Amino acid sequence: MNVKKAVVVFSGGQDSTTCLVQALAHYDEVHAITFDYGQRHREEIETARRLATQFGIAAHKVMDVTLLNELAVSALTRDEIPVSGELQDNGLPNTFVPGRNILFLTLASIYAYQVGAEAVITGVCETDFSGYPDCRDEFVKSLNQAVSLGLDRCIRFETPLMWLDKAETWALADYYGHLETVRQQTLTCYNGIAGDGCGTCPACELRSRGLDLYLADKAGIMARLYEKTGLCEKSVL
């Protein structure tokens, strides 16, 4: 029997956890890979470990990539740089970590190659996002082609959240029966506070705004999700 395998790039945050629960519904064997790059919100690594165990996935690999910290100066890799909602002179937020998704997706692909997975799943998004260039659809598709050529194997990059806004991402978690798990147990906050977070950093504001919109109009947001994704309709309370 052909076993369908996937590798999820997993931070323990809202987006990657939503991708994980979706992957568990569609693949026979799900692996997760988490990266320790010296991030200031290091609690996310332990959050990822706990959730991986809770969901009973096939394997969870935590990789030390702190070398990225030496090269990528960002508010997420330097405690002395305060997180700011303002854009820098280059038009990017100071939470952008140069090369992060290039490295993560490349290493996840190597891991997928080793375990025989057909897909690498990442929660990047171009709809409600922080302006990071390595979250764009164009980038993901380009790197996917390069990686497949370099490995001489077709490993498919899946981006299930790419065209969903944050409200629709909450709807997707709800569709798979894990709205409260994602809300209460994931860590998205740049200040390392799980659940609803600090409420003031850019990540928390984006997450909270999406949740409020979803809770105010579940039926309407879910209808949009069905239209965008082609998921079969089912009752969501």
Curated annotation (Swiss-Prot):
Cofactor note: Binds 1 zinc ion per subunit.
EC number: 6.3.4.20
UniProt catalytic activity: 7-carboxy-7-deazaguanine + NH4(+) + ATP = 7-cyano-7-deazaguanine + ADP + phosphate + H2O + H(+)
Residues binding Zn(2+): C189, C198, C201, C204
Record-listed ATP binding positions: F10, S11, G12, G13, Q14, D15, S16, T17, T18, C19, L20
UniProt keyword Iron-sulfur present: no
Keywords, comma-separated and alphabetical: ATP-binding, Ligase, Metal-binding, Nucleotide-binding, Queuosine biosynthesis, Zinc
Pathway per the UniProt entry: Purine metabolism; 7-cyano-7-deazaguanine biosynthesis
Gene3D superfamilies listed in its UniProt record: HUPs (3.40.50.620)
Biological process according to GO: queuosine biosynthetic process
InterPro entries: QueC, Rossmann-like_a/b/a_fold
Cofactor(s) annotated in UniProt: Zn(2+)
GO molecular function list: ATP binding; ligase activity, forming carbon-nitrogen bonds; zinc ion binding
Keyword Ligase: yes
Function comment: Catalyzes the ATP-dependent conversion of 7-carboxy-7-deazaguanine (CDG) to 7-cyano-7-deazaguanine (preQ(0)).
UniProt record similarity statement: Belongs to the QueC family.
Protein name as annotated: 7-cyano-7-deazaguanine synthase
Organism from which the protein derives: Aeromonas salmonicida (strain A449)
Gene of this entry: queC
